[in-house]
UniProtKB/Swiss-Prot annotation:
<dbReference type="InterPro" id="IPR017758">
    <property type="entry name" value="CoA_disulphide_reductase"/>
</dbReference>
<comment type="subunit">
    <text>Homodimer.</text>
</comment>
<feature type="binding site">
    <location>
        <position position="299"/>
    </location>
    <ligand>
        <name>substrate</name>
    </ligand>
</feature>
<feature type="binding site">
    <location>
        <position position="42"/>
    </location>
    <ligand>
        <name>substrate</name>
    </ligand>
</feature>
<keyword id="KW-0285">Flavoprotein</keyword>
<feature type="binding site">
    <location>
        <position position="22"/>
    </location>
    <ligand>
        <name>substrate</name>
    </ligand>
</feature>
<feature type="binding site">
    <location>
        <position position="427"/>
    </location>
    <ligand>
        <name>substrate</name>
    </ligand>
</feature>
<dbReference type="InterPro" id="IPR050260">
    <property type="entry name" value="FAD-bd_OxRdtase"/>
</dbReference>
<keyword id="KW-0521">NADP</keyword>
<dbReference type="GO" id="GO:0050660">
    <property type="term" value="F:flavin adenine dinucleotide binding"/>
</dbReference>
<keyword id="KW-0560">Oxidoreductase</keyword>
<feature type="binding site">
    <location>
        <position position="19"/>
    </location>
    <ligand>
        <name>substrate</name>
    </ligand>
</feature>
<feature type="binding site">
    <location>
        <position position="71"/>
    </location>
    <ligand>
        <name>substrate</name>
    </ligand>
</feature>
<feature type="binding site">
    <location>
        <position position="39"/>
    </location>
    <ligand>
        <name>substrate</name>
    </ligand>
</feature>
<dbReference type="InterPro" id="IPR023536">
    <property type="entry name" value="CoA_disulphide_reductase_staph"/>
</dbReference>
<dbReference type="InterPro" id="IPR004099">
    <property type="entry name" value="Pyr_nucl-diS_OxRdtase_dimer"/>
</dbReference>
<dbReference type="Pfam" id="PF07992">
    <property type="entry name" value="Pyr_redox_2"/>
</dbReference>
Length: 438
């Protein structure tokens, strides 16, 4: 009976194991997870802190016991894979509770160890990062135990923005700092102004081009020379792949520690796959490498690997489109396609339109700004971005499908919109992009 070992039990690993079991009732499947919890919703964590998700239990899909009862898959939490011997097809495992080490053999190995939050490196009792439910619980307990009021949020990516909004809605007083003036980097820089407007509207302090120099108790010294006091600091300064344990194997890593995979999600070593935040692949619509550490890619890759292991080698990963979205107070920001700094590799043109998200005469209308970049050589869409209070997700998802099917910008005129006054226009913003590009 084949033995399948999975490293990591969150989005990619647990989903892949579950899909394998759906297709294969016989194989022995075991998952090693270095942390306390499995199958939790990373994306829910800021909303747990903000009490939008009323109970943290809703962010936890399975316990190991429930997973085994439902699927006959063994999950061992607090078990960290610390080395891979790909020649012998074994992994070395550390039981983090007992410090016992042992080896586990495998016929197929699936790597989904995810990523860890970067830290600023200060030794302080008031600094926290947010990456898993343990972090969430620690933040929650600290807030309650210390009657936290003033919170410093460091970083301006989507996690930091979500955390800040949820702290504010919880009734706390957050301040945002970021080391540069480039915020929410997945968006076009000039489309991010509503982020600052939303902060200003609520009188939430923020400083760009600012960094922490020292932390002494609750006293924070900044690069600008300011000295301020905070009850708590939450750091959102990026992540790094959990690939240290892979370095001793023959598995190829890129210079950032990610694992390049082929379209079957295979590494360069036979019988070893990589999925989720650890893996890097390519775009679907253009010939460029891509790393997109978001939930969709982990779930899609999990299903493909399950099919591959079950014997269906016709299903392959066709690449990322990089579709992403974030809510910040009243606004939604979304983009799809190559990143802004990758556009320079193309001869491109940009076309944009700003108009109401639905019919102007219908109540509650607000502007939606939609922008599309296209390749001048074949007129295919390279990237799209949108910002507004409503209708952003619909337009970006439609453009994602257009890019998936390699439509030209001109073909957007043919998009047949589901029109009624509360939802759109007879000629939607997407249609208008096509007309303006002609």
């Amino acid at each position: 009976m084949p033995k399948i070992v999975v490293v990591g039990a969150v989005a990619g690993g647990a989903t892949c194991a579950s899909q394998i079991r759906r297709l294969d009732k016989e194989s022995d499947i075991i998952i090693f997870e270095k942390d306390r919890d499995m199958s939790f919703a990373n994306c829910a964590l800021p909303y747990v802190i903000g009490e939008v998700v009323e109970d943290r239990k809703y962010a936890l899909a399975y316990t190991p016991e429930k997973f085994y009862d439902r699927k006959q898959i063994t999950v061992k939490t607090y078990h960290e894979v610390i080395a891979i011997n790909d020649e012998r097809q074994t992994v070395s495992v550390l039981n983090r509770k007992t410090n016992e080490q042992f080896e586990e053999s495998y016929d197929k190995l699936i790597l989904s160890p995810g990523a860890s939050a970067n830290s600023l490196g200060f030794e302080s009792d008031i600094t926290f990062t947010l990456r898993n439910l343990e972090d969430t619980d620690a933040i929650e307990q600290f807030i309650k135990a210390n009657q936290v009021d003033k919170v410093l949020v460091v970083g301006a990516g989507y996690v930091s923005l979500e955390v800040l909004e949820n702290l504010y809605k919880r009734g706390l007083h957050p301040t945002l700092i970021h080391r540069s003036d480039k915020i929410n980097k997945l968006m076009d820089a000039d489309m991010n102004q509503p982020i600052l407007d939303e902060l200003d509207k609520r009188e939430i302090p923020y400083r760009l081009n600012e960094e922490i120099v020292a932390i002494n108790g609750n006293e924070i010294t900044f690069k600008s020379g300011r000295v301020e006091h905070y009850d708590m600091i939450i750091e959102g300064v990026g992540t790094h792949p959990n690939s240290k344990f892979i370095e001793s194997s023959n598995i190829k890593l890129d210079r950032k520690g990610f694992i390049p995979v082929n379209d079957k999600l295979e590494t360069n070593v036979p019988n070893i796959y990589a999925i989720g935040d650890i893996a890097t692949s390519h775009y679907r619509h253009v010939d460029l490498p891509a790393s997109v550490p978001l939930a969709w890619g982990a779930h899609r890759a999990a299903s493909i690997v399950a099919e591959q292991i079950a014997g269906n080698d016709t299903i392959e990963f066709k690449g990322f489109l990089g579709n992403n979205i974030v809510k910040f107070f009243d606004y939604t920001f979304a983009s799809v396609g190559v990143k802004p700094n990758e556009l320079k590799q193309f001869d491109y043109k940009m076309v944009e339109v700003t108009q109401g998200a639905h019919a102007n005469y219908y109540p509650g209308n607000s502007p939606l700004h939609l922008r599309v970049y296209y390749d001048t050589s074949n007129r295919q869409i390279l990237r799209a971005a949108a910002v507004g209070k409503e209708g952003v997700d619909k337009r970006i998802d439609v453009l994602s499908m257009a890019m998936m099917n390699q439509l030209t910008v001109d073909e957007l005129t043919e998009f047949e919109v589901a029109y009624a006054p509360p939802y759109s226009h007879p000629k939607d913003l997407i249609n208008m992009i096509g007309y303006k590009a002609k």
